[in-house]
From Swiss-Prot:
The active site is at residues 138, 191. It catalyses: Cleaves type-1 transmembrane domains using a catalytic dyad composed of serine and histidine that are contributed by different transmembrane domains. Coiled coil: none annotated. One of its GO terms (molecular function) is serine-type endopeptidase activity. Keywords: Glycoprotein, Hydrolase, Membrane, Protease, Serine protease, Transmembrane, Transmembrane helix. It comes from Aspergillus fumigatus (strain CBS 144.89 / FGSC A1163 / CEA10). It is found in: Membrane. It is a multi-pass membrane protein. Belongs to the peptidase S54 family. Pfam families: Rhomboid (PF01694). Disruption phenotype: Impairs growth under hypoxic conditions and leads to increased azole drug susceptibility, reduced siderophore production, and full loss of virulence in a murine model of invasive pulmonary aspergillosis (IPA). Glycans are attached at residue 185. This is Rhomboid-type serine protease B. The gene is rbdB. One of its GO terms (biological process) is proteolysis.
Length: 272
């Protein structure tokens, strides 16, 4: 009797993946669950989730302002949702761990959703005279990549491509262009709008929209959020502070130090 061949090893460690998922902070978990819920809702044929919640310039009005917040949660098909979830999870988890759960909620339900949407509507409707609807969490992916690129630029201004030095802050722009070229039905304008807001976030211009820590501590203490909510990240638990440069690299003393060419991004679309 022939001995069955051993199965090839998995490309990932299931135990480590499970451990990582169990350690995800609260807001990140909620975002992932809402994205999954909207994808499941889109499977039925009675009501179109995409038509209801997409960012459609001509549909924005007093009674449909909710679209400014719903479009990042909605996706077109399983592949769109799956790839965006893979790319968004580490970025959003890192942001929440650094800044706290309440700050993440205030920013992502507020300016980090509405500001990219505002830029997109302004250009798409009033300059391009078009009405292309967009959906997808890649708006947050490119926004967070833009913010991280600014932080990286402060400590490592350039990466080397052969003998050419390229500013590290441009890496999301290259990713945006490549995604638009190689991935069909993507929104270059939507991704670019997100990168612009990400740059502003990384430069600290959106600090005014962050609630003061005194107020956040009062809310946390009054509602006992840390004791009541599992995986909640309090103001005093955040890792590196709100706007500090992450200690992933150290700039060379007395000169600029190029970094190797590397990039963490997504190849998924923001669009129908």
């Amino acid at each position: 009797m022939a001995i069955p061949a051993a199965l090839p090893p998995l490309p990932f460690n299931p135990t480590r993946v499970r451990s990582y998922m169990l350690r995800l902070p609260l807001f990140t978990r909620i975002v992932l669950l809402v994205i999954l819920a909207f994808w499941l809702l889109e499977l039925q044929t009675i009501w179109s989730v995409v038509q209801w919640g997409s960012l459609t310039p001509n549909e924005i009005g007093i009674g449909s302002m909710y679209r400014l917040n719903t479009y990042p949660f909605i996706h077109v098909g399983f592949f769109h949702a799956f790839v965006n979830l893979l790319a968004l999870t580490p970025l959003l988890e890192r942001f929440e761990a650094e800044h706290g759960t309440l700050t993440a909620v205030a920013l992502f339900i507020g300016p980090l959703s509405t500001f990219p949407a505002g830029i997109y509507i302004l250009v798409e409707k009033f300059i391009l005279r078009s009405n292309t609807a967009v959906v997808g969490a890649s708006v947050w992916i490119f926004l967070l990549l833009g913010s991280e690129a600014i932080k990286t630029f402060k400590s490592n201004p350039y990466f080397s491509l052969g003998t050419t030095k390229i500013p590290t802050w441009t890496s999301p722009l290259f990713a945006c262009a490549l995604v638009s070229i190689f991935v069909p039905n993507t929104s270059f304008l939507g991704h670019l709008s997100a990168i612009i807001i990400g740059y502003l976030l990384g430069l600290g211009y959106l600090k005014v929209f962050v609630p003061p820590e005194k107020i956040l501590r009062w809310i946390e203490g009054k509602l006992n959020l840390l004791g009541r909510l599992p995986h909640y990240v309090s103001v005093d638990q955040k890792t590196y502070g709100r706007y500090g440069v992450l200690p992933t690299a150290t700039a060379a003393v007395g000169g600029e130090r190029p970094t190797p060419l590397s990039y963490l991004g997504t190849n998924q679309r923001l669009g129908p």
